[in-house]
């Protein structure tokens, strides 16, 4: 006989279900569950007097030799995902990959158990009833200035870091390039202990092909062109020729000073080939004042970096000082001051907010320690979304913010994965992908995860005093867990590399332990493939007033005087 209970009691026991609204942090963003995959009355819950026990929701007969038995079951969890939507389900993990989104349990005693989601004696279980699961974030603009960035990134929910550098050298301070085989090899060896997936850009600034090819063979997953090395048409053409031949992506920081041409000349050199543009608004660098127009082209995958996200009353002042440091400028040199002033434009930064909300800008990233904060990609994304809701209203949803939420989460999960040919491995919680999962309490969403899983094993978590009698006493702060230790770490994270380097067996050459996974399909994508962020309207910029127009309409917004997910979360 069925038992009817009040919705409030159900939510208190098993978490929200279809129609329930969940507030994200202290933002004004509300997510409503669209679909619930769980069978009412057969929910899996672990604990004293609960259902996950022998002969009930846990099978008594299934051994791990049965390929349908899970290694880890995350039960009753709310999922926010750019591809799956906003749903309620159990997540099944086996061999470090997601094998099921559905109903876990014991098919001998329960109805509607997803066939490959059996809970057995070999299954670890975590109650997700009052948590939100998201895919691990992907940051595609990493200056590898110091290895400690990885810990700060994972503590904000970033599990994949793509960029370049070799430590605190001037070249790395300014550009995201790991130049040449020697440096690439050393960086692979140096990053074995880091708890995140990693990919390196080779230096793309060369007008001849062979010096570029050898870096791809050495393990670069792509090439980075930067104006400080000379972003000339010849360099752009050469890098894209190599990328087309070897199936890797090209990222570009274009020519702020317009030394070798204007935006139109750069687009002519690109010649319709796919390219990933960094800080496409321009404050981080790029053709002044109209690099923002690049976002209208169907072959351009446009990204932002987080120091301009969102536009606030402090943005302009902060940027001038950052720029002087990162690009080795001198306030006593008039030309250097003019260079800085040309890049920092309130009008285009304001427009960037709106272009994100319209789905014209597709990717969010950090620019770590080089005019960006590596531990704030996720936070800045949701601050931007909240600011846009306050200033522009709803995006056509009926009583919730689901579409806006899916648009914004795509910017740091699936879209950077698509841009760099790794979406078959990461970027969403779809079946078959690496179990890189971030768990959040709703009130801390976007700021401080509960824990982060890498390939199905807990890597980092908020943890209390290890000498306490229970896990929760203060001081509570992020600590590396077993998944970030010793050989478990090298088994729980991967390197993303070129197919040419896999064929060259760099894993054996370099003596590295982490799995190397080849990027694929980098040259076949376009703006049309980016999830919820594929708009290509006509964009114009007034060369004197810097006003930005989209399809003829002037777009601008006021700077924020306060943002959510800020000081109240960082008192301690």
Swiss-Prot record:
Q: Which cofactor does it need?
A: Ni cation
Q: Where in the cell is it found?
A: Cytoplasm
Residues bearing PTM N6-carboxylysine:
224
Reaction(s) this enzyme catalyzes, per UniProt:
urea + 2 H2O + H(+) = hydrogencarbonate + 2 NH4(+)
Pathway annotation = Nitrogen metabolism; urea degradation; CO(2) and NH(3) from urea (urease route): step 1/1
Q: Which UniProt keywords apply?
A: Cytoplasm, Hydrolase, Metal-binding, Nickel
Pfam families, per database record: Amidohydro_1 (PF01979), Urease_alpha (PF00449)
GO CC terms for this protein? cytoplasm
Alphabetical list of InterPro entries matching this protein: Amidohydro-rel, Metal-dep_hydrolase_composite, Metal_Hydrolase, Urease_alpha_N_dom, Urease_alpha_subunit, Urease_AS, Urease_asu, Urease_asu_c
* Annotated binding of Ni(2+) 2, by residue: 224, 253, 279
Q: What family does the entry list?
A: Belongs to the metallo-dependent hydrolases superfamily. Urease alpha subunit family.
Q: How is the quaternary structure described?
A: Heterotrimer of UreA (gamma), UreB (beta) and UreC (alpha) subunits. Three heterotrimers associate to form the active enzyme.
- Database matches in NCBIfam families: PRK13207.1, urease_alph
Q: What is this protein called?
A: Urease subunit alpha
